[in-house]
């Protein structure tokens, strides 16, 4: 098992959550979230994250319907992943993110009630779930 550093993005049209993790431990933690305008992030913030954390791989959550089919947001998440690769040359993997937001909301509520459910916290927690799910799928 390698000790790669990974960043995960939970893509959304209004907000994007970010998590960081280490492949050797298979664990991730919430890093941040930032606003997006119609799915377009502040690319300077993205560049700062990539520069600061120097990930070996970036995992982008792929929103799918429960039956596994694509939805309108799926194409936008793919486009975001392609732009990440094109702008910064980072290796990208897409990973099924079905139910990550539901799970994140439940986890946050359990720990802090309604006050823990702000949008940024939910998005960053969703990115953690996406990355931990990716780790599990590798084994």
From Swiss-Prot:
Protein's GO biological process: rRNA 5'-end processing
What GO molecular function terms would the record report? nuclease activity
Q: Read off the InterPro entries from this record.
A: RNaseH-like_sf, YqgF, YqgF/RNaseH-like_dom, YqgF/RNaseH-like_dom_sf
What EC number(s) does the entry state? Answer: 3.1.-.-
Coiled-coil zones = none
Alphabetized, the UniProt keywords read: Cytoplasm, Hydrolase, Nuclease, Ribosome biogenesis
Q: Where in the cell is it found?
A: Cytoplasm
- SMART domains, alphabetically? YqgFc
Give a yes or no for keyword Protease in this entry: no
Q: Which domain of life is it from?
A: Bacteria
Where mainly located?
cytoplasm
Q: Name one GO cellular component term.
A: cytosol
Q: Does the keyword Lipoprotein apply?
A: no
- Please state which protein family the record places this protein in: Belongs to the YqgF nuclease family.
Q: What is the annotated role of this protein in its UniProt record?
A: Could be a nuclease involved in processing of the 5'-end of pre-16S rRNA.
Q: What is this protein called?
A: Putative pre-16S rRNA nuclease
Source organism: Pectobacterium atrosepticum (strain SCRI 1043 / ATCC BAA-672)
Gene responsible for this protein: yqgF
């Amino acid at each position: 098992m390698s000790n790669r550093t990974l960043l995960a993005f939970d893509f959304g049209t209004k907000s994007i959550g970010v998590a960081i993790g280490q492949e050797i431990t298979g664990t991730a933690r919430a890093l941040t979230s930032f606003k997006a305008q119609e799915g377009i992030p502040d690319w300077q913030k993205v560049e700062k994250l990539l520069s600061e954390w120097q990930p070996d791989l970036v995992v982008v959550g792929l929103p799918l319907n429960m039956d596994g089919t694509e939805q309108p947001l799926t194409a936008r998440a793919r486009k975001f992943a392609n732009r990440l690769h094109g702008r910064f040359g980072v290796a990208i993997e897409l990973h099924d993110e079905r139910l990550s937001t539901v799970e994140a909301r439940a986890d946050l509520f359990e720990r802090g009630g309604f006050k823990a459910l702000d949008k940024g916290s939910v998005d960053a927690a969703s990115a953690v779930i996406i990355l931990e799910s990716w780790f599990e799928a590798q084994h």
